[in-house]
Amino acid sequence: MVSRRSSQARGALTAVVATLALALAGSGTALAASPIGEGTFDDGPEGWVAYGTDGPLDTSTGALCVAVPAGSAQYGVGVVLNGVAIEEGTTYTLRYTATASTDVTVRALVGQNGAPYGTVLDTSPALTSEPRQVTETFTASATYPATPAADDPEGQIAFQLGGFSADAWTFCLDDVALDSEVELLPHTSFAESLGPWSLYGTSEPVFADGRMCVDLPGGQGNPWDAGLVYNGVPVGEGESYVLSFTASATPDMPVRVLVGEGGGAYRTAFEQGSAPLTGEPATREYAFTSNLTFPPDGDAPGQVAFHLGKAGAYEFCISQVSLTTSATPPPGYEPDTGPRVRVNQVGYLPFGPKRATLVTDAAEPVAWELRDADGVVVADGTSEPRGVEPSAAQAVHVLDFSDVTTQGAGYTLVADGETSRPFDIDGDLYQQLRYDALNYFYLARSGTEIEADVVGEEYAREAGHVGVAPNQGDTDVPCIGPRDYYDGWTCDYRLDVSGGWYDAGDHGKYVVNGGIAVGQLLQTYERALHAGTADALADGTLDVPEHGNDVPDVLDEARWELEWMLSMIVPEGEYAGMVHHKVHDEGWTGLPLLPADDPQARSLHRPSTAATLNLSAVAAQGARLLEPYDPQLAQTLLEAARTTWAAAQEHPALYAPGEAGADGGGAYNDSQVADEFYWAAAELYLTTGEDAFATAVTTSPLHTADVFTADGFGWGSVAALGRLDLATVPNELPGLDAVQSSVVEGAQEYLAAQAGQGFGSLYSPPGGEYVWGSSSQVANNLVVVATAYDLTGDERFRAATLEGLDYLFGRNALNQSYVTGWGEVASHQQHSRWFAHQLDPSLPSPPPGSLAGGPNSQAATWDPTTKAAFPDGCAPSACYVDEIQAWSTNELTVNWNSALSWVASWVADQGSAEPVPTAPVVTRQPVDATVALGADATFTAEASGVPAPTVRWQVRAGRGWKDVAGATGTTLTVRATARTDGTRYRAVFTNAAGSVESAVVRLTVERAAPVVTQHPADVRARVGTRAVFRAAADGYPTPCVVWQVRWGGGSWRPIPWATSTTLSVPVTVLAAGTEYRAVFTNAVGTAATEPAELAVQRPRS
């Protein structure tokens, strides 16, 4: 999971180029600049002139502006740039931005500044006060010089402004450019000679039939071991180019073609790692925009190179090559996503969820049909609109056909005029995936031959890094020399660190990544052991050479990595007992490169606390699992676990720096090691049962922390590994119930995220950003949810895991399976130096069961291929390219396949049998609710069971219970009123196996003192009538009201009969100036209204 900067991986190439003296000084055509300069006016008119205007040119605003007088003649006003060279037959693009203070159409042209005033471009742009960006592309039909001669006027760009408006107006111009497509190579034809091109590593060239042909001998480990190169090409950052050539290869053979740096770091502006060539000459054309600048000369000039080195012999022929500038940037990458109905292309288990996603803008449900292999409709229904799925920026519907249980192959879903890719319904779907995912690790072994008798001829290869030339490792490896990022550390010993697994697409071996990978392989076996399915991983089940030793094959594979990790322990000195962080090449190598052909020197890197604790954890884990098969090795592992634990305690903050990832290998930098301490303590406790390790576990700040985060766990965040093992491996840790509950709670969070996902994924990272290796984050989240099912038997977790797996196998934004060999359209060109069939047909593709890294929306981490594919960005779950040089999205690595291995083994155990019915068990009890009067109270209850239980809510009615009409969901909502105060409720869950009631809960309406909501108003009334006052108040219990009266500002006196919110009193002469108020009272308090006065009108005399 490390950046494989193969575009900078030129350490070996440097020596090759120096030896073959390819750094030739070129004299290529200068980089095509606009013949009119930069075209901006920040520094003045820049050679532009005006005539007939009302005043001089004005560039004070950064644009060139002129005032056009009223009533001007058609040719009487203009803005002109003279001295513009134009070449007949050349294609140009004129670009500019212009405005006019009044709506007007002007004349813009490229032509002659003199008779006969010919033009090669003549246009009439309509302008307004809003800036208009104009682009005109044309091929010149004449030649105009930059300097005028007799009868040969100079070229010009002119804007004729007169005669187009009766009123005075202002014209402004900015960002003017005239670009042409310029050939940058001085020699483009190979009909007769190489010209300034250099050829090496091939036979002598033969020139015939308008082309050059050479024989390649084969046996070349690097693409650059043979090549055709021209140095001296100027390349500019941000400029666009088109590279084309006509070539052939017999037999068919892809070659590596690049535009890049002919020295230094050998960076590339463009690279096509596998330009396909066949026996028939064909023209290949590649448009690109450079993100780098290379000069035409110096120690690292720009170059065009064909790297021809291959393992097999072949003939290469080429007739022409061209590199031209282009005014038009190439379009972005548009993936072929196939039908808009997205399914798990592998299929579905008979008794599990079966959902698909339809990408559609339809606002209403869409009809769907499920068809069998013969096209017969076996089920139908309508979709559920889900709105826009943010991770894909696509509007989606969900199709649910879970009720179909009939097994069969070749099913398809049809909806909205689209037919899905085919899939199966079969209980044995994933049995082979269990083995494919685990078989990846034998092929990743270092230090041993990969035997054809075990894996077949396609994947067989020589042992890598066993001290046989050209290898310089790994039997006697020194420490890296002093580096600033290691504070000058080095060592004076050498170690035999052969063995182990190659980490990813390179030849490096890393303890922290190997640690999580071997840990998950051991977890895969230990889970099967406790689930009663260990026979599925027994001796003879995997493609490994240890068959017949009565040891489960997955443990044989884990042992290979464990023994290598033991060899990485520091033997002596200040850091004795610590573990070296990694071993890898001292410089990057290119692709393809078999391990046995790697010529780089190797070095050990400084120990780290993280690496030391990784070994402590997996050595303890391995000790308990290998003890029945090899007690001596188990004892060695346990002793190493203790030793490294103690060493980490002594050096708790020795971190791997990020700067250590610049040369030859990834950094795997990690300065947060509390999680490694927690994991190691957990494994040591589970193996030994010792109180000291139990204490280390329970006192860790991570023991009660939420370690199951939205973005999942990985090599840099391993506390989840310890928590999962503590929850599942039998032990007597205090508070074990809480540990197990934390796993279930973490899984519930993933279920909540899945409910909002249009593609059913369990991965919902913070901010929606998909990380490097997102496929493994998906897989690790599946591990958590599947473990929750193992702990509880709750069918929700089983269903969520099965549905979450759909994402990896094609139910996603790209309609793409990320597991090689699994699904109709699956990743098969992952970044690897030896699974590199895309670059060399004699090499294999990644093996079936290889998990690709998957979408990565972190643009700062992108490789050049991915950057070129998405110049304008991409929806997070669509940032993926199945291309071997796209290492930031398409790498493969041991810790990603270890996660897949665990999940594959779990899902294979689910089989085809219908789940055994189990009675409902309440998993979430409702709780009492106290809410304000008029508010809604909600009660939620959940239960597990097989089949999934139905739910109905009941309310206490007298001495019995009565169903609440329509209340059949897991949440009940009740309005808080005086009538519902004190009401009791419960949920009843029922399935075929039984029924269970939840706890009884009570709704309580909050008590509240009276609050006046209506004050009485003053009243003016005639004698002999009645005056009416009104008041109101809220409160609970409902307040009582008593009206009061007073005269002349005296004391308030109650009116005993006035106990309504309305008071009606007779109006008499004596009542003049009387005041009234209402007093509201309940058990909580009292509130009085503002007083209201009665004004008496005397009767008319």
Swiss-Prot record:
Residues 329-880 are annotated as: Catalytic. Its EC number is 3.2.1.4. Residues 64-173, 212-318 form the CBM-cenC domain. It is an enzyme of class 3 (hydrolase). It holds the Pfam family CelD_N. GO terms for molecular function: cellulase activity. Residues 1-32 form the signal peptide. Residues 838-865 are annotated as: Disordered. The keyword Ribonucleoprotein does not apply. It catalyses: Endohydrolysis of (1->4)-beta-D-glucosidic linkages in cellulose, lichenin and cereal beta-D-glucans. One of its GO terms (biological process) is cellulose catabolic process. Keywords: Carbohydrate metabolism, Cellulose degradation, Glycosidase, Hydrolase, Immunoglobulin domain, Polysaccharide degradation, Repeat, Signal. The active site is at 506 (nucleophile), 831, 882, 891. Residues 918-1006, 1008-1097 form the Ig-like domain. The biological conversion of cellulose to glucose generally requires three types of hydrolytic enzymes: (1) Endoglucanases which cut internal beta-1,4-glucosidic bonds; (2) Exocellobiohydrolases that cut the disaccharide cellobiose from the non-reducing end of the cellulose polymer chain; (3) Beta-1,4-glucosidases which hydrolyze the cellobiose and other short cello-oligosaccharides to glucose. PANTHER family: ENDO-1,4-BETA-GLUCANASE (PTHR22298). Belongs to the glycosyl hydrolase 9 (cellulase E) family. This is Endoglucanase C. The gene is cenC.
